[in-house]
């Protein structure tokens, strides 16, 4: 009797397994990503950072999505927090369970609570730093679907924050990108109809 029950349950579930897709359906809602980032600085002006982002993108087709996002990051050596707001896009190379992708985030950020101001030391920010500045983050990674509406993403990105930073080689402040290597892990999901 137990064997018969197990076979019956397996047969009932089998069509569901066959129907389960391992990619997002553009007609079923937007791509949502909650992402956590950490990474070292790059070059002489780079800085370690930790952060989190939320992205909400609309599918243009099965491989391309476009939308907006917002986040928070803390820059450890420059001692400031950043609140970026940006446009975001993903391009998935294949429509399958495992899909490599490239993405781009570009927008502005607000610098909050800088502590290392006008010290004329490495990792110092000028007091003339504007309240809003440029943020850009190109990246590449892989998406792995767990179900038809939930997946995991892992990527590497170049996170650039335009800042009026002290350059110890030139012994003055100038506007430059503060570069970081972002190592990103995220949960992506699709809520039908949203």
Task: Briefly describe each language-model feature range.
Residues 55-137, 144-150, 184-194:
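Gram-negative (and chloroplast) outer-membrane scaffold detector with strong preference
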Residues 35-39, 120-126, 167-170:
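Extracytoplasmic loops and strand-loop junctions of Gram-negative outer membrane beta-barrel proteins
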Residues 1-24:
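Bacterial Sec-dependent N-terminal signal peptides
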Residues 33-39, 69-71, 103-107, 155-157:
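Transmembrane beta-strands of outer-membrane beta-barrel proteins
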Residues 146-194:
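Predominantly the C-terminal beta-signal and adjacent terminal strand-loop region
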């Amino acid at each position: 009797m137990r064997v018969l029950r197990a076979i019956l349950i397996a047969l009932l579930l089998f069509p569901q397994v066959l129907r389960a897709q391992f990619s997002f359906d553009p007609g079923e809602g937007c791509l949502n990503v909650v992402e956590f980032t950490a990474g070292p600085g790059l070059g002489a002006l780079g800085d370690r950072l930790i952060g989190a982002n939320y992205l909400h993108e609309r599918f243009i087709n099965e491989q391309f999505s476009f939308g907006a996002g917002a986040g928070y990051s803390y820059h450890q050596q420059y001692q400031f927090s950043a609140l970026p707001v940006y446009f975001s896009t993903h391009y998935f190379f294949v429509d399958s369970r495992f899909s490599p992708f490239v993405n781009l985030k570009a927008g502005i950020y607000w610098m909050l609570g800088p502590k290392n101001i006008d010290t004329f030391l490495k990792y110092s920010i000028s007091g003339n730093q504007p309240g809003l500045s440029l943020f850009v983050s190109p990246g590449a990674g892989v998406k792995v679907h767990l179900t038809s509406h939930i997946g995991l993403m892992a990527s590497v990105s170049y996170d650039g924050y335009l800042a009026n930073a002290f350059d110890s080689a030139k012994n003055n402040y100038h506007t430059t990108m503060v570069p970081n290597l972002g190592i990103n892990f995220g949960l992506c999901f699709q809520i039908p109809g949203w």
